[in-house]
Amino acid sequence: MRPFTKHTGLAAPLDLANVDTDMIIPKQFLKSIKRTGFGKNLFDELRYEDEGQPDQECDGRPLRKDFVLNQDRYKGASVLLARQNFGCGSSREHAPWALDDYGFRSIIAPSFADIFYNNCFKNGLLPIVLQAEEVDQLFAEVALREGAQVIVDLENQTVSSPSGATFEFNVDNFRKHCLLNGLDDIGLTLQQDAAIRRYEEKRMNDAPWLFLPRGQ
């Protein structure tokens, strides 16, 4: 998992409340258990005029020109501004996979659905909860200037707007540690590699019959 320390990126404003996980990545794309390849179908029903299908190429599909990610000024956005209750609905982990695969590093909203919020941290995305009026200010500033960037500083737990206004956010210390160091569940387990080896060696000494080849 990529570490997240400080990120400066183009912000895209998704001005919709209660965006659920089926809107983020529709159900027909959930067959794969690989974490990659979902970006082209992120917000599929909002981005495209037609209904997308698994393994379908998206280059020739008709776009909804009014959707934020289809507008030239927001191409390459890596910070998503959202409204309240983002990520509600089913608990599909494919939702943060799709956001990450598209290129987003952080999502800023007044509130998130709990399971989606937790899944973001496990997949290297930083979900940030700010006050509604602070999110409103970010939306307003991003709309005013093309190419407006937002600075997300995890170490200092601040978000800086395009005008330089700074907003503080809270994050659990353990989750912060994991993101700063790029540690997912596997990475955390590997940190205990020496202790795991010692345990296995002790088990082999205490109960060697458990480790005999089958049939012996």
From Swiss-Prot:
Belongs to the LeuD family. LeuD type 1 subfamily. It is an enzyme of class 4 (lyase). SUPFAM superfamilies: LeuD/IlvD-like. It catalyses: (2R,3S)-3-isopropylmalate = (2S)-2-isopropylmalate. Pathway: Amino-acid biosynthesis; L-leucine biosynthesis; L-leucine from 3-methyl-2-oxobutanoate: step 2/4. It comes from Marinomonas sp. (strain MWYL1). This is 3-isopropylmalate dehydratase small subunit. Pfam families: Aconitase_C (PF00694). GO terms for molecular function: 3-isopropylmalate dehydratase activity. The keyword Phosphoprotein does not apply.
